[in-house]
Every structure is written in C-alpha cells, then in structure tokens.
Amino acid sequence: MPTINQLVRKERKKVLEKSKSPALKNCPQRRGVCTRVYTTTPKKPNSALRKVAKVRLTSGFEVISYIGGEGHNLQEHSIVLVRGGRVKDLPGVKYHIVRGALDTAGVAKRTVSRSKYGAKRPKAGTAK
C-alpha cells in the first residue's frame, strides 16, 4: 500500500474499460456500404448457414455484421445501418445490421417482436 507522500507524487491510475464495438467510435449506429454478402457456419455444437455481410463503415473500419431475421434483400453496394451486438456462435461477428433502415428491408410477415426486425404493423383485417 502506498504512503500518502507517494500518492501525492503520483496518483492512482484509472482503469480504462475497452469498447466492445470500437468500429462505431462511440456512436450508437454507423452507416456503411456492403462489400460482400455471404453465409457462414457457426461454432461447434450449432449447425446452420448464418447470413452475414462485410461492411465498410463511414468511420473507415471494415467489419463483419450479422443480418438477423428470415430472408433479406441485401447485396453488394447496399447502404446499411450497423449497430453493436455480437453473435455468440460466429467468431469475429461483433455487429448487427439494423432491419428496416436505409436499404435494408424489414422482415416480411413478421407479427411478433416487429420493432426488432423493422416490420410494419399488419392491417386489422389480415389477422389470422
């Protein structure tokens, strides 16, 4: 334990917390352009074809981001909005693409958790 005199001479260092999404540069979301849209397979116990896109952000970073929901309309040169949030079974995927923003369409025929997938409220007559 340091003495008072040692603390006067050199104060204690603040512990800096590392950002989990450095490419966003402290912004809630960033705009970017898709450079490649493809599928990849998850880590060991899981099996699927997960849809991901390589995106060049306005901050200058090129990141891999996950496309959530069933079906998408993204292709190369699509303008997308990227938020933070990793995908646990895809190594290196630390970002999500926001559905229903910019060039990304919302999920069609989605009735529950619509706000997460950019789906509009269905008409009253088309229920069930």
From Swiss-Prot:
InterPro entries on file: NA-bd_OB-fold, Ribosomal_uS12, Ribosomal_uS12_bac
GO CC, alphabetical: small ribosomal subunit
Gene3D superfamilies: Nucleic acid-binding proteins
Pfam families assigned to the protein according to its UniProt record, in alphabetical order: Ribosom_S12_S23 (PF00164)
TM ranges: none
Keyword Lipid metabolism in record: no
Modified-residue entries (3-methylthioaspartic acid), positions: D89
Disulfide bonds: none
SUPFAM superfamilies on file: Nucleic acid-binding proteins
GO biological process: translation
Keywords carried by this UniProt record: Methylation, Ribonucleoprotein, Ribosomal protein, RNA-binding, rRNA-binding, tRNA-binding
Function: With S4 and S5 plays an important role in translational accuracy. Interacts with and stabilizes bases of the 16S rRNA that are involved in tRNA selection in the A site and with the mRNA backbone. Located at the interface of the 30S and 50S subunits, it traverses the body of the 30S subunit contacting proteins on the other side and probably holding the rRNA structure together. The combined cluster of proteins S8, S12 and S17 appears to hold together the shoulder and platform of the 30S subunit.
Subunit structure as annotated in this protein's UniProt entry: Part of the 30S ribosomal subunit. Contacts proteins S8 and S17. May interact with IF1 in the 30S initiation complex.
Entry protein name: Small ribosomal subunit protein uS12
Protein species of origin: Campylobacter jejuni subsp. jejuni serotype O:6 (strain 81116 / NCTC 11828)
Gene: rpsL
